[in-house]
Amino acid sequence: MATRVASVFSSLTDVGIKAALQDEAYKRIKSNLREAEIINPYSVDARGAEALEELAIITNPHSIRLHTHAAAKSIENQMLNIVGHALPKEPVTFLFLKRGKLRYLSRGRIKDIFQNQEIEPRDVARYEHKTIVQKSLLLNTRVAYISDTLHFLRPRYIIDLFSQNVFLDVLYATVVLPVEASFKHPSQNPAIYTINYNYGGFQYLPGNHGGGAYSHEFEDLDWLKYGKFIYRWVDYRTDPISGKRVGTPKELVVTCQLVESLGANHLFIFKRGDLKTPRVRTFAKDKSVTFPDLFYPEEENANFPVDAELATKLFLYVKTLKTVTSQDVHGKLRQLLRSDELTRFSPMQLTHMVNYFMVVAHLDSCNDYSMLLGSSVWTQLTAPIQSKLRKLTEFFKGKSSFGKFCAALKWKTATYSLEVVDYVETRRDSFEPHPLDSLPDADDRDVNYDTDVSEDEADEKPAPKAPTSTPVPDTTPPASPAAPADAEYTQCWAAWDTVIRKHGFKGNQAQFDDDGNLITPIAEIKSLPKDSPRCAPELIKSLQEIARTPTLVEIDSKRSNAFGSDVKNGRIGMILKKQPNDWRLSFAAKCEHTSRKVHACVIHGAGGSGKSQRLQDWMRSLKKNSRECTVILPTAELRTDWVNKVPKQSLDTFKTWEKGLVQPPNRVVILDDYGKLPAGYPEALCANYPNIELLILTGDSRQSVHNEHNKQAATASLESNIEFWTQYCRFYVNATHRNVKRLANALGVYGERDEPLKVTCSSHVYDGWPVLAPGLLKAGNLAECGRRAFTYAGCQGLTAPRVQILLDNDTPLCSQRVMYTALSRAVNEIHFVNTGPSGDDFWTKLDCTPFLKTFLELSREIEIPEAKCQETAPAEATVKTHFPVENPNLVLEPYVEKMAEKFDRELYSKEYGYSNAIQTEDPVIQLFPHQQAKDDTLMWATIDQRLAITTKSENETEFALKKDIGDLLFINYHRAMKLPKNPIPFDKDLWQSCKNEVQKTYLSKDVGSIVNGVARQDPDFPINEIKLFLKSQWVKKVEKLGMVVKPGQTIASFAQAPVMLYGTMARYMRRMREVYQPSNIFINCEKTPADLDEWAKANWNFEGLAHSNDFTAFDQSQDGAMLQFEVIKAKFHNIPSDIINSYVELKTNAKVFLGVLKIMRLSGEGPTFDANTECSIAYHHTKYWVEPDVAQVYAGDDSAQDRTPVPRPSFNKIKDRLGLVSKPLTHRQVPGDFATFCGWIITPKGVIKDPLKLYASLQLAIRRGKSHEVALSYAHDAGLAYRLGDDLHSVLTFDEAHAHQCTVRDLVKLNKVEVLRPIWALD
């Protein structure tokens, strides 16, 4: 039907007017087609063109340019065009974008920056080499754009990008993700792309072309739902006044919004800040419906989306026929579906659809409900009752035919709109600095090898790189006259003055090493014949200028034969072992029988002397992608350095040593740092490739060399490459541009950098500095912890402004070459990290008893005294109270009034009489029973209550019978703590570290305590013998104030050696547990109240009921089942079997003076706290089903969580076989009934100490005259509540507020106001 505008044009009959209108229209069409030629220059079929026009993309019907996926490519270009209009007219950083696509962005001559990274192999051909960056991206622009790559990355990438680049404010990003893949539906735009679902993921095929396909995991589709990226961390800084570390919660929020959506291509904008974004993200019009289920089971229904128009047509068709057959519906369905749409439905889906409409066709569509039209008043009044009765009847008998018909027509709209979700990440590791808080220096971000030369780019800004650490001048510095005092010494190398200046040194200083020996910049001079090849004349000329003319060298067949033998027999290399057998046989034969000479130039010099500068200058002068030279490097890191310094040459110019053997080299071969290559490598290379005319070897004869670990290899018996080829080196450049003069001279090297040298030593590893470790294991562990770690020997080629060198027991084993390599890495600052024991007090403790050294592994060091600055004590400030003053006498008065007389509360024994736990005449002190080790009545009551005597055989039987229970406990513990599927490999370094921690903790005791334990340190002290003591303590639990005295707690005194051994085992498993521990579980071990407070604020949910738990007789209830659990857990951590067996032996045969103890937990056995905590977790998750996101806290037998757990029915079958009995409590999470944990109350404002318990404990200390000993600790506990201010009114009851005010008042009187509220928090 023509519109009114079209009708007006059709009413014009004058030929001239029509011609003029057509001419005007043609001009506009021509202009539009010219613009469309940029976006869509391809020939697109009719269906594709129609689909593109729906997306407002024009197709030129006369275009003949073909493309495998033209329609999808046109959408990509259109997205770039949209981005180009959105970008500001200022420099922008383009990520993952080819320079050739700038024309779609209409960017003009704006100096944009291109940074690309190789995410997948095809990126090698996609991006220009000079735009490739190898390390973390540094963005210096306000706006950036990521092109069609974000869907291959993880959400953390957005957080990293914004956190590491403080200038970045806006990020545009295009992604290619079909939204229908979220529901595993076929493509909604089959003319543009198709989707395959295979192998647990989906494959996006643009234009049905497999060559352009991308494979995705379903989790990649989450990019379509993210609305905000939230990263939370705590910024720890040192208070300049108090010197304490103060944590400030911080948050980075990046808001994301969908800007445009064209098919599977979507444009998003990411803006720094917490902004609004639509709750629902719409990608396409809702045009499909799903049918209700008519049959059982569910899969036998047409429960897939069907086009609403098609469904309506089929519905009307089946209801227009008097008699409907299956053939009719199949035929109509085939008629309505185009041929290209047939593959959208499987035969089974078509069958289910036909069955659905067959049912609908046979159901009665005539309404059989009561008709109100023209009915009587009585009928109208009773109609609702009749309707309800009918519904009730149909509920039992089933619906009528019309009711079924209506139910069958309740179609649901199938939508591709998605609800927006937030991506939230919280940093847990307190030692990990946040990028926004401590951006590393530029020198720390990039590793430079030897020298670096800047290169100007003509039309673009280069990707930001770190400044070169060891620059070498491009021009020869002018000769400076030597000082009169130095002139006598500098005459020693006057003949080499020109060569020295060609290397960038003045050579006019007399420098001496620490032994007083003169350091000469040129050393190890040899006279060799000169014989230059005809190739590379410019390079030969450059080498002659620095006295490095090549010489003719005969290849040593013995060395090449040994190397060829190792290659043939697969003794060395990784790639070489995978080569075909014929290739390896041929390689070995050439090594054995080839005899030849080759022109060689051997360049030796100290690190940073500029050995490779001339070579790199020559390679930069070559044409782009020249085939003149091949550079072979020992490591991938060194290869990357050469690629960055000589970017004009193709990537295959630079090869690692194995690729250099497999792939033929060019006629000029450079072996950089050849001392790190396997012995015999240069000879074997020349023997196999006769096209090599010039061999250049650069290295340092003073640094570490390759060490062949396979002692069966033939090359293991050869002298190193350095030792053999040194005879062909004309001289050694004993000077450096890298190290400052003081450091260079200490290493016996000449240097002219007059900068101060800083050397420090501590036990702390700094963040951001490269770490050098003596061995591979330590370096590997440090690297896994996020450190930039190298071995002493493997750091060759590294240049950094400052490095830290780890010292341990392996350091003295390193050779002089290795130590020289490590010490020469830094420019001007070295930090030594000493992880071993030190200090005079340490050795005093070690010598105080004769047995400590028998089981402690230690090495002695001399500690350099450090000057300590004096801290000025801040002036005391007046504290403003925010609670009304209360009468302190009324807090404990109710307990005093109910308290019975002394002997009514004491325990009584016929043999020993009354116990003596109620002491003094002070009624407040009498509230707290005082349990003492010398109280025999209490001691025997405790033994009767806490200990059970049995035999070793009964314990072993108990242990064996509970293995199945132990398995169940560990399975649930494994799931709760998210441990890996496979057992954790044993880490010897971590074990040693834990061992050192246990030893350090023990030796931190005062000398008197260590001497008192001399008997337990005796090797003759029986391993399984235990001495029992009664723990002396004041019982301060609020629920026990003024109550009858209860049995106390025992302390078990074991032999010291097994205590430390099993303590090491527990600490080792704790460290491993912390690696995998989920963030919603908090274990109060080595944590502070501030840590608990921070965690509770971030994780605890106060909306429902909370749960807490304690146990009855927790220690003595840990029977054979818990021991089995401990053993299985230890085996999962690959603890050595002899340690596990000895632990089982100790637990099943623990002897006291009464006999063998039943299997139980004993305080003092080593792993008490860790074992108690882990047993509590295992028991809790075995008894209850706990959702994965529930916040949980554990410490020993105490635990709590923010939701009530669901009991497992299966637990009832095993609870009788477990000795543990829990005491669960439910909390309403309102004032007076919040969850409690270890004396802390978890409130919406944070955790606070139980005010009544804190007040009672403080009163006991005050009345005993011990307030000065506990005031500081109690002030810290009360401070968390005090600093909440008036917020306390919302979390405390009247009685709790009363106790809190009285506690604070007493602490103020004790001069602890600065602890209650730090100086920085005062008004």
UniProtKB/Swiss-Prot annotation:
Residues 1104-1211 form the RdRp catalytic domain. It catalyses: RNA(n) + a ribonucleoside 5'-triphosphate = RNA(n+1) + diphosphate; ATP + H2O = ADP + phosphate + H(+). The keyword Nucleotidyltransferase applies. Its EC number is 2.7.7.48, 3.6.4.13. ATP binds at G605, A606, G607, G608, S609, G610, K611, S612. Transmembrane segments: none annotated. Residues 734-867 form the (+)RNA virus helicase C-terminal domain. The keyword Nucleotide-binding applies. GO terms for biological process: DNA-templated transcription; mRNA modification; RNA processing; viral RNA genome replication. Disulfide bonds: none annotated. It comes from the Viruses. Residues 432-486 are annotated as: Disordered. Keywords: ATP-binding, Helicase, Hydrolase, Multifunctional enzyme, Nucleotide-binding, Nucleotidyltransferase, RNA-directed RNA polymerase, Transferase, Viral RNA replication. GO terms for molecular function: ATP binding; ATP hydrolysis activity; mRNA methyltransferase activity; RNA binding; RNA helicase activity; RNA-directed RNA polymerase activity. PROSITE patterns: ALPHAVIRUS_MT, PSRV_HELICASE, RDRP_SSRNA_POS. Residues 572-733 form the (+)RNA virus helicase ATP-binding domain. Residues 60-224 form the Alphavirus-like MT domain. Belongs to the potexvirus/carlavirus RNA replication protein family. This is RNA replication protein.
